Amino acid sequence: MMNESLTEKRNELSLSFAALGVVFGDIGTSPLYAFGQVIKYFPINDHNIYGILSLIFWSLIIIVSIKYLVIVFRADNDGEGGIIALAGVIRQKIKQPGGWLLFITLVGIGLIIGDGMLTPAISILSAVEGLESLSPNLAKYVLPVTLIILFFLFKMQSIGTGKIGVYFAPVMLVWFITIGILGFLQIIQNPKVLMAINPYYAINFFMIHKYFALFILGGVFLVMTGGEALFADLGHFGKKAIRTGWFAVALPALLLCYFGQGAFVLMHTEDIKYPFFSLSPDWFLPVMIILATLATIIASQAIISAAFSILKQASLLNLIPRLKIVFTSKFEKGEVYLPLINFILALGTCSLVVIFKSSSNLADAYGIAVNLDMLITTVLVGIIAYRCWSWHAFKILIFLLILIIELAFFAGNIPKLLTGGWIPILIAFLGFVVMYTWHCGFEKLRELHHRDALMDAFIIDELNQNKISRQPGMGLYIIDPYDCEGESLLHHLRLNRIFFENMVFVSIKIENKPYIPIEDKFELIKKAEGFYLIFIHYGFTENINLPNELDEMFKRVYLPFDIIKNKLIYFIEIVFVEMTGERQKHMYLWQKHFFSLMIRNAVPDIQFYQLPYNNTIAIGTYYQF
């Protein structure tokens, strides 16, 4: 029993250690730019620095430690976190939640795309800017070095991070220990800064500066960027490992670093461009720049991988067009590479670096996307607490308090809209337009298939009465998500009158859960003599390999005919959309053209379901929009 307990503890510590290299990369590198961004607005004196440090301390405690690690962690979807997981929990409880949930989900995904561009840009740029601390003459190399690092970062996505990923956690552990020690060395020289733990200084800061203090919250918010990753990566490491990593390593190191920067600037009141690098002794500065660059690369890798993961889930749920998905690891099922998304992120990130040129300028664009993402999380978890946990009104007030605090941060971020904050909003809006247009087009296809279902119902009767001649063999007809029960393929059979002796229609259903146990995965319905409908249920995080799944199904589900695997013939549908020029419900003409473009360029079923090319027949179907 004792050995089992020790083994369990070792496993938990191992997971906590691994989490350092993924979960805490973004929030762990915020000290590079966050504190310097805040202090530039005020003269350096005890009242201002204590007030800023107090705001930083209580922001990390209330929003990250209490909101995320205590409350939001309760809202996991079978151990999985993130906005799609939260939406899935709500859909399980509220069967028809309405358009508001779709709207929030699409906006949240759009913000994640923006975050995937901004995080690598500001993180790596802020690390390379340490060269200016070595020598002002090196300032001209900051931009090209940053772009070179970003180029190789996105280039290596196609080969995966399996081989180098094992070094992420050790590097981040060294990073946290280093910034903690550097901060501590400054605190012992000016220990009075620890008084800022008292919330009085945060309140006093607002009383002195009044409305202008609200503006500073936009800068303070930067210390929490990356906090949403703690919940998004829940499925990879679990609650206990992330909580241990945060409270034992990340949070103490961050607080020591921020308070150390506060102590340093109070002892050196001259203009300090990069207070973080000023903590480092001159002899250690080159090492610190290299370590900071490695840490920001790891932080950037984490957000890129998260973007791949969330967009893969969105693709499975048909929130976006089907994307080419490359699995870069034989051992880690969640390690995927999306070539198109990688290109978009790379182009966006490099463009941001060239346009803004410095981390200080980029900071204005950065915080607002994460702020909105956190607001969405608060709203969704509040709904879950009310509808799923049956929290009474008093407990729900906790969410109201958190919402007020986050809205105050959002108010502080609003002035940034004029100096770059509009960029993540624009990215999210463009992402929303793509996803909403795709959704509207899918709904139109569903409507057309419903009409076909009414026309083709008589085929079932003819099959039952043996009025249709059949040829030997078996056909597997893969039903698209917009097709309820294979009406389009049934319509094809009605037209050409080619019916196999045994026909199996296979429908893929993506559920609102991350994983579906094998015993609940398959569902067989006999529609007519020799005509079967099979539902295969997937979770939104699972990988689809239809031939492998069918092999498993044939072992578990009884079919009254023999299956010869190498002679199976798969039938899939290729959709062609023809424009009518008329405006239809929820779709303008430009949306119809855009949907037609997307569906033509989406990954075809044969790739998406990993079907054998030599045994697959594609049937083209035209639809009038």
UniProtKB/Swiss-Prot annotation:
Protein's recorded name: Probable potassium transport system protein Kup 2
Subcellular locations according to the entry: Cell inner membrane
Location, primary (coarse class): membrane
PANTHER family: K+ POTASSIUM TRANSPORTER (PTHR30540:SF83), OSMOTIC STRESS POTASSIUM TRANSPORTER (PTHR30540)
Pfam families linked to this entry: K_trans, K_trans_C
Gene behind the chain: kup2
Membrane topology: Multi-pass membrane protein
Family statement: Belongs to the HAK/KUP transporter (TC 2.A.72) family.
Presence of the UniProt keyword Cell membrane in the record: yes
Catalysis performed (reactions): K(+)(in) + H(+)(in) = K(+)(out) + H(+)(out)
Single GO cellular component term: plasma membrane
Claim: Transcription is one of the keywords in the record: no
Function: Transport of potassium into the cell. Likely operates as a K(+):H(+) symporter.
Organism of this sequence: Legionella pneumophila (strain Paris)
One GO MF term attached to the UniProt entry: symporter activity
Keywords carried by this UniProt record: Cell inner membrane, Cell membrane, Ion transport, Membrane, Potassium, Potassium transport, Symport, Transmembrane, Transmembrane helix, Transport
Membrane-traversing stretches: 15-35, 52-72, 98-118, 134-154, 164-184, 212-232, 246-266, 284-304, 336-356, 365-385, 394-414, 417-437
InterPro entries: K+_transporter, K_trans_C, K_trans_N, Kup
